[in-house]
């Protein structure tokens, strides 16, 4: 069993909403490009901005033509057919220009895509035609980028391996960063196990503007019968001295003194941001890597949910602190289905 503390509404109501990406088509029946920028924290009103960008679009392959070798092959533009949708995260950089200049530069990119595999399925991106507005990101764009296929492609199995594939950018998601920065809790700290401790996890409840059942994300009915989605993230451990007794009130008081503020961003699709505005113990602060603002991209927490809702309207409707006994150190984590040294099964 776990004890729950519900955060007050004011802790997430200011920046807890993301507007949807409008999907409109032009005379050629192609989607009209659109840029969506959301502010996290208090960015400067004028001048320089720090932007985290995610490019969204369609994977396309050239259509096969019947009149091979004709003169029209040299004069007519190549037509493409859509074989999937996906994204390309390009990171954070300092940007001085306008949103429309950035959108134009992103849609002009030539992005070639290849589906491959290492320990798991991967998507390889190679980028060309980098315009001036994207020069702050050029250090990353000029190098080949590899991502987990299940995080950046909605249906990687639909991407052919024997054809040329391109990513046509249609939408640009941007997170404008102010006092809040993008810092993730390192995996070694998130997986930390301390004896005599209580794990503080956050249960985040979302309301979206689309139906997600047909795409494999089942909602949960709340007390009012409304369909909601939720996910959990780990914040840290509360540890007491040997002999001290844990109580729900003690854990609640520790959380209340932190004065946490929650917001939604667009890092990797949809991201959940936590800012500490109150006091923290040194033990808890060290578990946050000495950061007072941390980011939880849904791309890392729940990739499939992220891909289903990253273009929809999303709103935080509740955040709960869940106090659970920390997992004992002697419990073993099995990241693979094939376990070592069991019968005739052996790992190389």
Curated annotation (Swiss-Prot):
Known function: Plays a crucial role in virion assembly and budding. Forms a shell at the inner face of the plasma membrane and concentrates the HN and F glycoproteins. Acts as a negative regulator for transcription and replication by sticking to the nucleocapsid. This effect might be regulated by the cytoplasmic interaction with tubulin that dissociates the M protein from the nucleocapsid.
Alphabetic keyword roster: Host cell membrane, Host cytoplasm, Host membrane, Host-virus interaction, Membrane, Phosphoprotein, Viral budding, Viral budding via the host ESCRT complexes, Viral matrix protein, Viral release from host cell, Virion
Compartmental location: Virion; Host cytoplasm; Host cell membrane
Domain notes: Late-budding domains (L domains) are short sequence motifs essential for viral particle budding. They recruit proteins of the host ESCRT machinery (Endosomal Sorting Complex Required for Transport) or ESCRT-associated proteins. The matrix protein contains one L domain: a YLDL motif.
Gene field: M
One cellular-component annotation, GO: virion component
Pfam families, A to Z: Matrix_Paramyxo_C (PF23765), Matrix_Paramyxo_N (PF00661)
GO-annotated biological processes: viral budding via host ESCRT complex
Subunit structure: Homomultimer. Binds to the cytoplasmic regions of F and HN proteins. Interacts with nucleocapsid. Interacts with human alpha-tubulin and beta-tubulin. Interacts with host ANP32B.
Keyword Phosphoprotein recorded: yes
Signal sequence region: none
Post-translational modification: A large portion is phosphorylated in the cytoplasm, but not in virion. However, this phosphorylation is not essential for virus replication.
Record InterPro entries: Matrix_C, Matrix_N, Matrix_Paramyxo_C, Matrix_Paramyxo_N
Keyword presence, Membrane: yes
Major location (coarse): virion
Residue numbers covered by motif YLDL motif: 50-53
Record protein name field: Matrix protein
Membrane topology summary: Peripheral membrane protein
Entry's Gene Ontology molecular function annotations: structural constituent of virion
Recorded family membership: Belongs to the morbillivirus/respirovirus/rubulavirus M protein family.
Residues found modified as Phosphoserine: 70
